[in-house]
Amino acid sequence: MADNKGKTVDQRKICISDYIYDLPDERIAKHPIAQRDACKLLVAGRERGIIADTHFYALPEYLPQDTLLVYNNTRVINARLRFRKVTGALIEVFCLEPVSPADYEICFSGSGPVVWKCLVGNAKKWNEGTPLHGSIAIDGTEICLTAERLEQLPGGEFLIRLSWTGGHSFARVIDAAGEIPIPPYLNRPSETCDSTDYQTVFSRIDGSVAAPTAGLHFTPEVLSALDKKGIERAEVTLHVGAGTFRPVKSECIGEHEMHSETIIVERDLIRRIAELDLSRTLIAVGTTSVRTLESLYHCGCLICQNRWDGVIPQWYAYSDEHPHLSRHDALKCVLDYLDSNNLEHLTAHTRLMIAPTYRYMVVDGMVTNFHQPGSTLLLLVSAMIGDNQWRQVYDYALAHDYRFLSYGDACLFFKDR
């Protein structure tokens, strides 16, 4: 695929070392500031460079009045479960995604046993066939929670069956039994305050093991200001997986296996975007919303080619076989697919890798945080504003006391059409 200067670039040969920058530990925000929307906001565009150094509560001033703002409504679950063996050994079960039932809504609403793909800490001390037991209290009643190790998967994860007494939904059980999983780079244990600090005002659909952190800056006051300006809002669902923290260990990104995440988009929003005038601005809140919306486009292209199997492959966007449909035509294919299958929403698994030279087909800009050096999220940012601009933005932020990563400050980026 050609880059913005017309030169042919092989995305798979992009060196991750070109996306490394020095991030001192003291610049990593360990907690959010007291007033969420008082964090700093750096506004920049691919062509315009740095536009403003301001605060997040001023966000509405920098969005065109015709903006459609799309955010992720996923909610972080208390995914860390700890069990103590009779020998005293501590076993941690980190729930990643449901396997049986695989549907998130059915899994969380059900009261029967569930099977999850999990990471297991201290797994060598837990023999297969030996169940672990723990007790929790729900509404003053003691509940017994049991974990059974079924099998180890090729990637090192385990299939774990969880069952419990009391007839409560799994949503209530994991909420009572688990601990919220904060990012590993915070280098601290989770605290009581994280149960609220690490949820967005949009969160309502259980399923993530990490927060869509760009949404952490929004407050009722910011939402009210957006409403007063007439800015429309809509929601998508991407359940953020632990793979979002997976470092790129290979020198070339072509050797990196992109993690899969589940996306859910309602039919009505797909229709709205398909009918959206191209002159209007669509801003995604967070890289998860970006990935969801762009995956939606590629889903339509796969449907058009009769190749849809429920998964957007990692490198499909760059394939010579890609049909490069217009946004409207691709989303029309998705709508036709939903109609023919009598579905009200699209559920898919995306492995989409957004890297430099990627052509954004749905979003015009995004609200996001400052990301880890050498991460796939930084590649996504570079794809939007360019290599020179992301470095200029990050250098400026480091020189002007911006706070980085999940609990840090925010950016508003435009791809500048």
Residue ranges of model-derived segments:
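Surface-exposed, charge/polar-rich loops and edge strands
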Residues: 2-417
